[in-house]
Design a protein with these regions (language model features):
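Acidic, PIN/NYN-like endoribonuclease modules and their adjacent C-terminal/linker elements
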Residues: 1-2, 109-140
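Short, well-structured N-terminal submotif of metal-dependent ribonuclease cores
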Residues: 1-39, 49-66, 140
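Histidine- and aromatic-rich ligand-binding microenvironments
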Residues: 5-6, 37, 100-102, 123
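Active-site phosphate/pyrophosphate-handling residues
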Residues: 8, 45, 106-107, 133
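A generic structural signal for short hydrophobic patches within well-formed alpha-helices
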Residues: 10, 41-44, 127
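Active-site neighborhoods of divalent-metal-dependent phosphate/nucleic-acid chemistry enzymes
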Residues: 46-52, 70-118, 122
């Protein structure tokens, strides 16, 4: 099984004291079965760039550049034409039901749907509404 890690999973693992349930779950997964979307990397970059504390921003930038990107080398899901076509269908499904999706989450959902992956996230609601397999390691 392939797992697509949401931004909040990587952020949680960066914390000085990550949630033990999340650590336990991630430790059960083979690294080669874990993937990230390029949208996740963009969300991380955005979060880093808005930090006003320069030393903290530099530390997080080093984490992204020297740890996360190399760790997921060859396992970053790009945004392709097929993923964008799936994204557009999901946008339309949401419109018909009166739901507006978070765009980074919807791109991640479209990526998971296209590649047959399960999303690992704390915020399942967007992914449930997009009808993609999702697991929240914070839940029992």
């Amino acid at each position: 099984m392939a797992w697509l890690l949401d931004t909040n999973i990587l952020s949680e693992l960066r914390r000085s004291r990550p949630e033990p349930k999340v650590l336990s779950f991630i430790e059960t997964l083979p690294l080669e079965h874990m993937f990230v979307s390029v949208a996740t990397l963009a969300e991380l970059r955005y979060g880093i760039e808005i930090i006003t504390d320069a030393p903290r921003r530099a530390d997080l930038n080093a984490w992204l550049t020297n740890i996360i990107r190399p760790m997921f080398d060859q396992r970053v899901i790009p945004i392709t034409e097929d993923i964008m076509l799936k994204w557009r269908l999901l946008v339309e499904e949401g419109r018909k039901t009166g739901h507006t999706f978070s765009q980074p989450d919807l791109i991640i959902a479209a990526s998971a749907a296209h590649h047959g992956m399960t999303v690992v996230t704390r915020d399942r609601s967007q992914f449930d509404k997009a009808h993609v397999p999702v697991i929240n390691p914070w839940e029992p």
